[in-house]
Every structure is written in structure tokens, then in C-alpha cells.
């Protein structure tokens, strides 16, 4: 009896995981999350430049951030949208892809390129 209830619970939760139709509110939330990933990546790049982080930490953390950005890219590229915002949603998907690419580059932990990546991530995320 517990197994069918568990399966039903999982089936009900799956659509809530970055699924469904993208409306203006969801687009704003996803956009803010993508900006946050870019800004967090910029902070990590700053630590690399300053020598304030280790290579394993940078590799793992940048990889996790890149995966999350890639997930937004995939979801926003495929999900249906409410009328009138499809272009904005697809543009945000492209931005998420750019952020993911930059974060993958940061995984290499190259201090020379980290300074450039920091600037590009700050620009993508419109970081303060």
C-alpha cells in the first residue's frame, strides 16, 4: 500500500520540477536564478584570481553551478510559454547556455583566464 502512494507522490512532484508552461512570473524567477548563478560564478572566479580557493573546490563548485545553468538552458529551450513571451524565454535560455559555458571554463581553475571569466560572468548576471 505504501509503494503506490509513494509512486503517486513522486508522479505529482515531477511536473513541479522546472516543468509546465513558462509564464511571466516563472520567467522572472528563472531569470533571477540564472543571474544568481552567474554572480556566484563571478565570486568564485574572484577567489581563483586571489588564490583564495583550492583547485578541487573550484572544479566541483563551478561544475555544479554549470550543471544548474545547463538545466535552465534545457528547460527554457523546450518548455511551452504563455503567448507573447516565447522570444524572451528563448533569449533567457541562450543566456543560461552562455553562463554554463563560462562556468565550465572556470572548472579548469586557470588563474589567468579566471579574471576574464569573472568580468564576463558579472556582465551576464548584471552583478553589482
Residue ranges and their predicted role:
Residues 18-25:
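Bacterial lipoprotein signal-peptidase II cleavage site
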Residues 1-7:
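Bacterial N-terminal signal peptides that target proteins for export
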Residues 13-16:
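C-terminal motif of bacterial Sec signal peptides marking the signal peptidase cleavage site
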